[in-house]
């Protein structure tokens, strides 16, 4: 509109003074160019850059405007759990062995923390007095395919994060997973399967000389497979009351949003091999691990922001 009015004024003055149309057009273009400050393009660029920088600090970098329009119409967000909402660093926080419940401090794959009973730390040098607890932690080391290594100033894992969490818990109790594996050389194994819901390893042992079959998997399965329970350093008969109590502990831990695993064992003849028939009967129950995957701090804020914007957040997980 301003350009049209400016052109009309130039044309009117030009006609009154008898200028040629081409001359009047040149005057109009010159007036239009002179009306725009020389620094305006730079000012616009700086303003846009500052705006983008401010949006970037809020994690809102836009490349396609339709994406923003779609987000503005969103009412529900469905998100994966492991590695998205959580850190993908499984951490053992509870242990149940020998009829006692233990708390494990620390987070992630850094083996810094302690095991507590009734709020009091269980010293690593006194771990032998807690035979069932030690046996549970050792079983988590040998019936395990993960690796925990200290490289370049940080702890790294190789393998499944759930199995790595068992190694971290053992180290917090002063148990070295690699030393236990050397003492109990693996002779045979049963890989984990979703049908069986457990995995097992047959390991050589110093005492007794017969190999030991360690089984690790779903608590309901292992409780059903067990006929005895390790308590006070002795394998005692597993009564129906004991079974119900173990199932209640499993339900209690699961109710705290913990992933629960169980371990059991049995001693086999020297010539025996690991097979499902042997792994599913006459086991000695050791105990339970309760573990969680800590949430990402930024995920907590993102979910709060989404809820504040009226967006429902639904977690989709394989658990």
What positions do the PLM features span?
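Conserved cytosolic headpiece of P-type ATPases
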Residues: 1-318
């Amino acid at each position: 509109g301003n350009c049209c009015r400016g052109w009309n004024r130039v044309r009117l003055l030009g006609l009154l003074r008898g200028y040629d149309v081409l001359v009047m057009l040149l005057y109009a273009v010159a007036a239009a160019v002179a009306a725009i400050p020389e620094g305006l393009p730079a000012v616009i660029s700086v303003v846009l850059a500052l705006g983008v920088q401010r949006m970037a600090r809020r994690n809102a970098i836009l490349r396609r405007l339709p994406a923003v329009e779609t987000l503005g119409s969103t009412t529900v967000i469905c998100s994966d759990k492991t590695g998205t909402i959580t850190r993908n660093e499984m951490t053992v926080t509870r242990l149940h062995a020998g009829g006692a419940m233990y708390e494990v401090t620390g987070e992630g794959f850094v083996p810094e923390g302690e095991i507590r009973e009734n709020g009091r730390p269980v010293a690593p040098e006194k771990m032998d007095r807690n035979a069932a607890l030690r046996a549970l932690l050792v079983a988590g080391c040998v019936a395990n395919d993960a690796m925990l290594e200290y490289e370049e100033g940080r702890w790294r894992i190789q393998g499944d994060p759930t199995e790595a969490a068992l190694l971290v818990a053992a180290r917090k109790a002063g148990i070295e997973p690699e030393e236990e594996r050397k003492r109990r050389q693996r002779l045979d194994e049963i890989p984990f399967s979703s049908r069986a819901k457990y995995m097992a390893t047959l390991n050589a042992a110093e005492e007794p000389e017969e190999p030991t079959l360690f089984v690790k998997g779903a608590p309901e399965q292992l409780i059903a497979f067990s006929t005895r329970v390790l308590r006070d350093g002795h394998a005692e008969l597993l009564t129906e009351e004991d079974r119900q109590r173990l199932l209640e502990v499993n339900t209690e831990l699961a109710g705290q949003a913990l992933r629960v695993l169980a371990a059991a064992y049995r001693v086999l003849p020297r010539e025996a091999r690991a097979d499902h028939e042997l792994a599913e009967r006459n086991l000695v129950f050791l105990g339970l691990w309760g573990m969680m995957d800590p949430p990402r701090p930024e995920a907590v804020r993102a979910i709060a922001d989404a809820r504040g914007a009226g967006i429902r957040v639904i977690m989709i997980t394989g658990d």
